[in-house]
Amino acid sequence: MSDRYPVLEGAEPFYFEGSRVGILVSHGFTGSTQSMRPLGEAYAEEGYTVCGPRLKGHGTHYEDMEQSTYQDWIASIEEGFQWLKERCDTIFVTGLSMGGTLTLYMAEKYPEIRGIVLINAAIEIPAMEPVLQLEGTRFLDAIGSDIKKTGVTELAYEKTPVKSVKEILTFMKDVKKDLPKVSCPALIFVSDEDHVVPPDNSQTIYGLISSEIKEIQDLKESYHVATLDNDQKTIIEETLKFIKRIL
C-alpha cells in the first residue's frame, strides 16, 4: 500500500479464524470489502474461517486503481486463498459482481474448491464495450452503489478509470471462455433488476459451467449490490444452507 493512497475506513481486508472449513469472500469492481463484510461476519458467526481480501487498487483512490491490472486483482484473491489453505481443509468461494468473475476464475483454476456462490457475477457488460475505443479519457462516471434499499451507500469510487474498464473487459472474456472448466457445485444469485451487470449473465454462466449441482436464485428486492440491499438476509441464509448441503 502506498502512503499516498491510505485505505479508506471500512475498506480494510477482514479475517476471521474458525473451523477447518473456509470461505473466501470477494468484493467487486471499484468497490470495497464493505460490500461483503456483513456476509463475512455472518459466516464467521456460524463458525467458519473467513477471508475477505481487499483487491489491489481498491478501497483507496481511483487513481490507485488506475495503476492496477486484472492480474493484480487475481493475485489479491489468491493471497486470500493461500491464507485459508493454511488453516482449512475445505474452501468455498463467493463473490459479488467482478468478485463473482474472480470466483469463477478460481473455480476454473483450482478444482479442489468445494463450491462457489455467485452474486450478480459479471462475464459480459455490453455497455462497457465502447470504452475500448476511448482515447484520451482517463475517468468515467461512478458505477457503484446500485442499491434499491433507501439510505444505504456502497463504499465505492466516485470515478471509474478507463484503463480499469479495459482490464475487466479482458478478464471477463478470458473467464467466460473457460467456464466449462467449472465443475464444483454452484449457487447463483441474480437480481431481477440490475443497472450494472445484465441479469442474463447469470443464465449464461449457469448454461456454460459443467457443474452437476447448480441452481439459480432470483433476488426480487435488490439491485446490483445485493449484499447491502433488501435481499442480504436471503443471500446469507441460502449460502449457509448450500454449504451445509455440500459438506
What are these regions (language model features)?
Residues 43-64:
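Conserved alpha/beta-hydrolase
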Residues 61-87:
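Catalytic nucleophile-loop/oxyanion-hole region of alpha/beta-hydrolase
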Residues 117-127:
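Active-site nucleophile loop of the alpha/beta-hydrolase fold
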Residues 182, 188-190, 194:
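Short beta-strand/loop motif that positions the catalytic acidic residue
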Residues 195-201:
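Conserved alpha/beta-hydrolase "acid-adjacent" motif
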Residues 203, 207-225:
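Catalytic histidine neighborhood in serine/cysteine hydrolases
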